[in-house]
A protein has these predicted regions:
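Loop-to-transmembrane helix entry
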Residues: 2-18
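Structural signature of the two symmetry-related core transmembrane helices
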Residues: 38-53
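A membrane-interface helix-boundary motif in multi-pass transporters
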Residues: 119-137
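Loop-to-transmembrane helix entry/capping segments in MFS-fold secondary transporters
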Residues: 5, 92-102
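Multi-pass alpha-helical transporter architecture, strongest
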Residues: 133-162
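Helix-to-loop junctions at the C-terminal end of transmembrane segments
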Residues: 22-36, 121
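Helix-loop junctions at membrane interfaces in 12-TM secondary transporters
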Residues: 56-67
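Intracellular juxtamembrane helix-capping segments at the cytosolic ends
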Residues: 77-90
């Protein structure tokens, strides 16, 4: 199952491209049906399943490639959906501040997640990282039921936002 590091792109590039291409249908559905929060919840569940499967199904390159594709679909949809929700929920005058706080906490989360993931992997093995991620996703999934679909802005195309 070993793939030399110089060939990792053989797996990652197709997974990233597939994830990018397949993120469009859920995003379009969420916008057209005013179901962005529903799509977000679905993708949180989608990633939870992916993390659990990562803990068990990393025996072949094909399994890894498939799971990476699943991961990147969920990740890309959430990466587009979350700032969208923040900008819709925040008052117009505070939208820039809200997005700044979002981006700052996102970067803090990258650091903390990387540090915790490394410590967990070192002490309990790589499978434990996936289980901890799945558990965190379940907490996020449960807490997402407090969210309501934000109102769609009522403005004409090309109208200046005030």
């Amino acid at each position: 199952m070993r793939l030399p590091s110089e060939h990792h792109w053989w797996v990652y590039l197709p997974a990233v491209i597939a994830g990018f291409a397949l993120m469009a249908p859920p995003l379009i559905f969420g916008e057209k049906k005013q179901a962005v929060v529903l799509v977000m919840r679905f993708m949180i569940g989608f990633l939870t399943v992916a993390f659990v499967l990562f803990a068990y199904l990393i025996h072949s390159i094909w399994e890894i490639a498939f799971l990476l594709g699943i991961f990147f679909i969920g990740f890309n949809v959430l990466e587009a959906t979350l700032p969208n929700l923040v900008s819709r929920i925040a008052p117009a005058a505070d939208r820039g501040l809200a997005l700044g706080v979002y981006n700052t906490t996102q970067n803090i989360g990258l650091f903390v997640g990387g540090a915790l993931g490394g410590a967990i992997s070192q002490h309990f093995g790589p499978e434990a990282v996936f289980f901890v991620c799945a558990f965190a996703m379940l907490i996020w999934f449960a807490s997402s039921f407090g969210l309501q679909e934000p109102a769609r802005p009522n403005r004409e195309p090309g109208e200046v936002i005030k």
